[in-house]
């Protein structure tokens, strides 16, 4: 089974969270950035609030839980930034029955390093095998499928 997520490149150096959410909901990164980026950067909007505003059903995790990447769906993950010293970076990992796929929104920006699934970066100078990350939230494949097909979604608990 191929991934449901379509890669989008973040249009500015600090828009990885908004771009990851845009990939999840199938909207343009620029639209989501215009709608949510500044309040998020200012600390007036949390990732949880962003997910809820977008109607995304998810399971949240504490970094102490260290959940395995076993269930099919999309994992919203925080990893160390490869391009901003001391910074964090948001990526997506989609798990399907045929493996896992890493979607790094910085991929494609000039001279920016980006994460790839282990063993997939060989010979690509800017591609770095993904090592450490923390799972922030998990979205079931069924929820993504329903969103994309226009099926009615179950009400999201606040």
Residue spans of the language-model regions?
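Contiguous, function-dense segments enriched for cysteine-driven chemistry
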Residues: 1, 70, 134-137
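Active-site nucleophile-adjacent alpha helix/oxyanion-hole segment immediately C-terminal to the catalytic cysteine
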Residues: 1-56, 152-158
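Generic serine detector
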Residues: 2, 15-18, 28, 62-63, ...
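Hydrophobic transmembrane signal anchors and adjacent membrane-proximal interface regions, especially
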Residues: 3, 114-117, 142, 146
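Extended aliphatic helical segments
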Residues: 5, 17, 25, 74, ...
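Generic alpha-helical secondary structure signal
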Residues: 18, 79, 118-119, 137, ...
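Conserved active-site-adjacent core of cysteine acyl-enzyme catalytic domains
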Residues: 31-129
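Charged phosphate-binding loop/patch that engages nucleotide di/tri-phosphates or the phosphate backbone
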Residues: 123-158
């Amino acid at each position: 089974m191929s991934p449901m997520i379509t890669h989008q490149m973040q249009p500015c150096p600090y828009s990885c969270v908004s771009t990851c959410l845009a990939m999840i909901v199938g909207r343009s990164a620029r639209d989501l950035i215009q709608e949510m980026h500044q309040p998020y950067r200012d600390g007036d909007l949390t990732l949880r609030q962003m997910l809820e505003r977008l109607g995304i059903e998810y399971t949240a995790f504490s970094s102490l839980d260290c959940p395995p990447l076993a269930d099919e769906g999309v994992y919203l993950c925080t990893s160390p930034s490869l391009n901003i010293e001391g910074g964090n970076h948001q990526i997506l990992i989609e798990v399907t029955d045929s493996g896992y796929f890493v979607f790094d929104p910085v991929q494609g920006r000039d001279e920016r390093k980006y994460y790839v699934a282990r063993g997939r970066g060989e010979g690509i100078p800017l591609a770095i095998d993904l090592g450490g990350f923390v799972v922030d939230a998990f979205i079931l494949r069924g929820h993504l499928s329903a969103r994309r097909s226009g099926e009615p979604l179950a009400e999201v608990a606040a």
